[in-house]
From Swiss-Prot:
Pfam families xref list: 3A
One GO cellular component term noted in the UniProt record for this chain: host cell plasmodesma
UniProt subcellular location: Host cell junction, Host plasmodesma
Tagged with keyword Phosphoprotein: no
Keyword Transport: yes
Organism: Olive latent virus 2 (isolate Italy)
Name of the protein this chain belongs to: Movement protein
Keyword annotations from UniProtKB, A to Z: Host cell junction, Transport, Viral movement protein
GO BP, sorted A to Z: transport of virus in host, cell to cell
Span list, region Disordered: 1-24, 273-337
Biased composition (Polar residues): 1-11
Protein role: Transports viral genome to neighboring plant cells directly through plasmosdesmata, without any budding. The movement protein allows efficient cell to cell propagation, by bypassing the host cell wall barrier. Acts by forming a tubular structure at the host plasmodesmata, enlarging it enough to allow free passage of virion capsids.
Organism placement in taxonomy: Viruses, Riboviria, Orthornavirae, Kitrinoviricota, Alsuviricetes
Amino acid sequence: MAGLWRSNSTLDVERGRNRTQTETVQTVPRQAQGILELLSSPAAREALQGSDFARWRGVPVSPAGGYFELAPLRSVNTFARGLRSVFGGSTSRREAYIPQHGFYRLNYVLVAVVPHVEHSDPGEVTVQLVENTNPTRAVDGQELTARLADGSFVFAAAPTYDIVLEQAPILVEGESAGVVQRMFGIRTSVSGSLTTGSVVSVYPIWSAEFPIQGATFNHVAPSIVHIDRFNRSVAFEIDVLRRRFSLMRPLHLARSRESFQVGRMSLDVARPSVVRPPPVDPQAEGGIHVNSPTSEQSQGEDRVPRAGLASGTSVGEGANHEFLSGAVKSTAPVRQT
């Protein structure tokens, strides 16, 4: 969890690193450069301010791989005192953003992966949804591998269970190696690449909450949407992917007035408790489509995250996907490990 709380000296180091990254971007292929600028643009950050997503920040990944926990970073500070009053705990910084009782629910995670390699690079990148107590094992088979030469893509995954907020031992090669707070995370590894240094950057966004009642969920296979050039079609496809995970997973869900949703509080009684997106017409856009749930599948759904990929409404509508303007998806093969 290092880096969640940063001192002034740490910020100075990050500013220097950001300048180095800016210089490095100039050497990457034009496609990756454009995508990086798009994902890091002020418009993207501003559009996500009101959403349920906890993070929209590039994380460089070296050939040795990388791991980060899907813990709330930004907006949870707004209601940290509310979390403590509901769930108890001290006023330490750790307990200010993770309650000590109840459950951690990861609704879904989307990870934009941007390679920084030549078009002929033979390497592959594997993205896994893992639990930090066993960071080398994918949760529920939520793992996919793609060729670096195929370009940028978005990886979507979701677990089938809630995590109990408790301390648990870390397993490294089957042996205990300390104790941590249980959390979900994303592990990225690179193999076979001829590039040294940072091979890819990952941009994780996710929706999570801390309910006081646990639930189990339908299994939804992990998915990848390849991106060649940004246009409205791919923005539409990514949002369909998000809807698929948010609508098809729940088996049983007990909505609680004491449930806090990352990005905003879920106690707004002025809004309806059920917000379903309009049905998706698979023929409306070109490219590869992700099946949306039927009305029978979505019946009984108590909670749907209110935010779209860009802001409070779908990125497939109106001006909310301006920062995702562009894309023709490729039909590059994806190998599931």
